[in-house]
Amino acid sequence: MTSVVVIGTQWGDEGKGKITDFLSQDAEVIARYQGGDNAGHTIVIDGKKFKLHLIPSGVFFPEKISVIGNGVVVNPKSLVKELEYLHTEGVSTENLRISDRAHVILPYHIKLDQLQEAAKGDNKIGTTNKGIGPAYMDKAARVGIRIADLLDKEIFASRLKTNLAEKNRLFSKMYESEELSFDEIFEEYYAYGQQIKQYVTDTSVILNDALDAGKRVLFEGAQGVMLDIDQGTYPFVTSSNPVAGGVTIGSGVGPSKINKVVGVCKAYTSRVGDGPFPTELFDEVGERIREVGHEYGTTTGRPRRVGWFDSVVMRHSRRVSGITNLSLNCIDVLSGLDTVKICVAYDLDGERIDYYPASLEQLKRCKPIYEELPGWEEDITGCRSLDELPENARNYVRRIGELVGIRISTFSVGPGREQTNILESVWSNI
């Protein structure tokens, strides 16, 4: 029994797709366990970029099984579009499996997401408007439609009719917006269901059978710990649990079967959307990091907010997710800076604290306490070991490991698979 979980430790966009792709080379099954097509990951293979939002990174390995677990909310329209994109690029999807227990995102979820966000005005959360939150709301309210329901024509029609009647009353009465058509949604989405039914199965059985057989299973998280609905910067969070604990709920695999948790982070910090960000940069250094790091959302295209590395955030992520190994990305983006900074603690009303407050009001008053380190001028994109890094870059990497309290297993100096360097295999000693 060998399993590794890959999670984001910041606010998403840490490079999980790349690291999952890298670790997938030694895995036999790769599974997603939460989120939806609000998650975007970019994978570079042989110099070619592939952008996915829903299908796991493991799809690029035809000999491995790629799983969308029950904790994922699936937009069938987006899924079919992504399948067509992969087929056009010559990528086979025969290895894909989709949980029959996963919930379905429908047009009324997307419309409700947009209307609710618009109604918040200045208090908007910064949602991707993909219908993720409303879909999880229906799931919790026990009125959601699952993939298994989508494939059954009579059940789908019955549940869609009931749900749409309620949603249309909400649209017309509360938001004074146009109602949606039952016939249009039913015909379009039932057809999508038929297009994906070949992939649908009980994925919990597949995952547990694989683990019981001693196969290597890799669980791929979406978003990041700081966007977790319980442990993140609530309410500026997603509607699911990106933390490692979400694996067991979202995949149907018990906690005793999880061996290692790899936390993925950047050598700096980024965030899309609104919410607290203590180390955010508003100067020319921030702009430089954004441009050099191509910090624009994969899903939204929005410019990402950027800031210095925050070890307070990282220690919070380590604690609530039980992170055992760290993967440090984008070190190359910081090349050319005279000085690099790491936030080691916060100043809250004159008191030094080393924890991440739950209160948004306290977070607003938190000022980062920085440790400054000398930067490096060298181009490090060709470095293939820690020893090849310039001394200052090497010291920066080591200091991050010391402050976070997690051993660094891999570090990356560019987007390519070959630019990911192994310090310690996460598949060993399991």
UniProtKB/Swiss-Prot annotation:
Gene3D superfamilies: Adenylosuccinate Synthetase, subunit A, domain 1, Adenylosuccinate Synthetase, subunit A, domain 2, Adenylosuccinate Synthetase, subunit A, domain 3. The active site is at D13 (proton acceptor), H41 (proton donor). Its cofactor is Mg(2+). GO terms for cellular component: cytoplasm. GTP binds at residues 12-18, 40-42, 304, 330-332, 412-414. Pathway: Purine metabolism; AMP biosynthesis via de novo pathway; AMP from IMP: step 1/2. It is an enzyme of class 6 (ligase). Its main location: cytoplasm. The keyword Magnesium applies. Keywords: Cytoplasm, GTP-binding, Ligase, Magnesium, Metal-binding, Nucleotide-binding, Purine biosynthesis. It catalyses: IMP + L-aspartate + GTP = N(6)-(1,2-dicarboxyethyl)-AMP + GDP + phosphate + 2 H(+). Mg(2+) binds at D13, G40. IMP binds at D13, E14, G15, K16, N38, A39, G40, H41, T128, R142, Q223, T238, R302. It holds the Pfam family Adenylsucc_synt. It is found in: Cytoplasm. SMART domains: Adenylsucc_synt. Substrate binds at T298, T299, T300, G301, R302, P303, R304. It comes from the Bacteria. Its EC number is 6.3.4.4. GO terms for biological process: 'de novo' AMP biosynthetic process; IMP metabolic process. PANTHER family: ADENYLOSUCCINATE SYNTHETASE (PTHR11846:SF0). Homodimer. Belongs to the adenylosuccinate synthetase family. This is Adenylosuccinate synthetase. It comes from Streptococcus thermophilus (strain ATCC BAA-491 / LMD-9).
